[in-house]
Amino acid sequence: MATTGPLLSLAAGVMPDFSPQQTVAAAAESGWPAVGVWYDPATWTSATTIEMRDRIADAGLIALDIEVIWLKPGPDDPAHFAAIDAGASIGARNVLVVSSEPEPERTAEKLQRLSDHAAAAEMRVCLEFAAFTTVGNLQSALSILDQSGCEAVGLLIDPLHLARTGGTPADLAAIDASRCPYAQFCDAPAHGPPPSDVAAIIHEALDLRLMPGAGQLPLTELLAVLPRDVPLSVELRSAALRDTYSDPTERARALLAATQQWFAPA
């Protein structure tokens, strides 16, 4: 069991059935020090930005990240830059990016432009890899980061995605600590769906994650190779958690208690 105490953030993905405003309220009421924010370009307005900025500030919360920018083939999407602008206004430290762009060099170029846009607000653009994206593993993500030529672009590690793409904590040992401004955190069984079953992999990622300590992922080993006390976005996407705790504050409180228990000294 780990003994350190990093900054813990309630990930937006824990609350897919609630608005960003409700997620912030739940985080504040249940004692989380930080929160993640879901950005939906179809519903987010300038009024949303002002309201979220004020809610986060009034609650004394840290906005660890805003998500998600999903890169796709074609020209740059203005909504991606708008997401960064919204994140900057609410004080978000990082913006989460995934990619379905088939050409790695195009992903790298888009990341560079997004990172340049975020730099003025001292935000980090962080690339997350997953089996169901075109950045399918750690090695692909690192290659794209190198191609971007931008040291400010970060790497986001999700323990579930690392395990399901064949990675291990040892694979992270040689990565420059500055590449990882934060990480995600959850548990899961040691073995998941077969790599060929993409639908099942997505289902596990969205609905079957486990509380820290309830699975067999090498979480202690993972934290040992990540930067010391790296902030953690607790990404507990779980249908069981949602069904058990329909109230957002109760859900947030239960997840925080379980996560803190994992970090408590033995």
Identify the residue ranges that each predicted region occupies.
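Active-site acidic/histidine proton-transfer and metal-coordination neighborhood
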Residues: Q21, L71-L155, R164
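Conserved beta-strand positions in the central sheet of alpha/beta enzyme cores
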Residues: G36, D65, L96, C126, ...
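Short, structured active-site "lid" loops
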Residues: A57-V68
